[in-house]
């Protein structure tokens, strides 16, 4: 009985993989539909926030699953990438579920369990990132850890690889390319559209550079990245020591982030992905204006006044400003929205 259900499950899994490979656009539309559903659910009924976050997490996991299927089938990463890719995938799963786990733990078991769940998640993430940094030489680690695929570019590249010089015929008058029967791919690898003829230039799918080993950071660069990785743990420990209303945890976290960014800015020969991640971290320093206790003492009254003025005097802005004003207190109570 169990073997029969297992066979059915494997058959269903294979059918879904074939569907994603043959219809990546349809898979993308499915992910967007699930994500849109999470927005529609929010605020509709009691416990809608938890359900909305669950659906949103499911959409992120679905995108991660579909990217993994396409990456394995169409890009064929080398076997040596397997263990590193699994660590990145688990890191992506944790980041996709962290908000739902936090609010679910708070709802089911209370605030102490919520903080325990937050600490466990941050410890797991830090351990995975430390292994990637020191064992796999991952360099500056980006967020999200698994770079989303350029699916259209990968499909076109897969077609380019399958369309060698003798694999298709190009009509002289119509310039239309037609595959030969001998060189047609198997049914689950076949793309049901006309082959494209290119000038031989390699397409950039967004995968090549981001999947390479990180740049050589050197001693100071590695120390700076380790500071960035351990900053959430340090912040949680300082919260436990001085309390949530103290300025000390806020200042310690800000000092660690600024120190890490300053040291990493001096590292040369960073890849394009690493430079983009460094710019993202610089921009995220603005989040400290929205983090307590700075938010409670300075930002809250000014931000609410600005949103109220925009909502009252700028046509159409109120549709966004008023729900945002209502949501800000909820957003402030969720740790991973602020400090994740």
UniProtKB/Swiss-Prot annotation:
Segments of this protein annotated with the region Disordered: 196-216
Annotated keywords: Membrane, Peroxisome, Peroxisome biogenesis, Transmembrane, Transmembrane helix
InterPro entries linked: Pex16
Domain of life: Eukaryota
Membrane association type: Multi-pass membrane protein
Region described as Required for peroxisomal location: spans on this chain: 71-86
Residues in the Cytoplasmic compartment per record: 1-89, 137-340
Bias (Basic and acidic residues) ranges: 196-215
GO CC annotation, single: peroxisomal membrane
Cellular compartment(s): Peroxisome membrane
GO BP term, pick one: peroxisome organization
Keyword field contains Iron: no
Peroxisomal side: 111-114
TM regions (residue ranges): 90-110, 115-136
PANTHER family in alphabetical order: PEROXISOMAL MEMBRANE PROTEIN PEX16
Protein function: Involved in peroxisome biogenesis.
Protein family: Belongs to the peroxin-16 family.
Protein name: Peroxisomal membrane protein PEX16
Organism: Xenopus tropicalis
């Amino acid at each position: 009985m169990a073997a029969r259900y297992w066979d059915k499950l494997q058959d269903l899994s294979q059918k879904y993989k074939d569907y994603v490979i043959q219809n990546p656009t349809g898979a993308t539309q499915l992910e967007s539909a699930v994500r849109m559903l999470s927005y529609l659910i929010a605020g509709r009924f009691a416990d809608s926030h938890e359900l909305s976050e669950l659906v949103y997490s499911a959409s992120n996991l679905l995108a991660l699953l579909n990217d993994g299927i396409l990456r394995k089938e169409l890009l064929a990463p080398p076997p040596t990438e397997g263990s590193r890719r699994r660590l990145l995938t688990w890191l992506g799963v944790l980041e996709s579920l962290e908000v739902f786990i936090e609010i679910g733990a708070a709802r089911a078991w209370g605030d102490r369990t919520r903080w325990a769940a937050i600490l466990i998640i941050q410890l797991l993430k830090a351990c995975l990132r430390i292994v990637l940094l020191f064992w796999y030489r991952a360099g500056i680690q980006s967020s999200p850890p698994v770079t989303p695929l350029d699916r259209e570019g990968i499909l076109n590249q897969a077609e380019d690889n399958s369309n060698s010089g003798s694999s298709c015929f190009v009509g002289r008058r119509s310039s239309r390319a037609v595959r030969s029967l001998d060189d047609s791919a198997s049914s689950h690898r076949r793309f049901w559209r006309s082959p494209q003829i290119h000038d031989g230039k390699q397409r950039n799918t967004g995968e090549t550079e981001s999947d390479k080993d990180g740049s050589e950071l050197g001693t100071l660069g590695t120390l700076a990245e380790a500071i960035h990785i351990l900053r959430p743990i340090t912040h949680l420990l300082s919260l436990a020591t001085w309390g949530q209303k103290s300025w000390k945890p806020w200042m310690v976290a800000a000092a660690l982030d600024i120190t890490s960014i300053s040291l990493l800015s001096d590292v040369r020969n960073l890849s394009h992905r690493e430079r983009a991640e460094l710019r993202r971290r610089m921009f995220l320093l603005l989040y400290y204006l929205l983090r307590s206790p700075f938010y409670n003492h300075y930002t809250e009254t000014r931000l609410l006044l600005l949103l109220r003025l925009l909502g009252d005097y700028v046509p159409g802005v109120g549709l966004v400003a008023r729900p945002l004003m209502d949501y800000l207190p909820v957003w402030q109570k969720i740790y991973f929205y602020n400090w994740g």
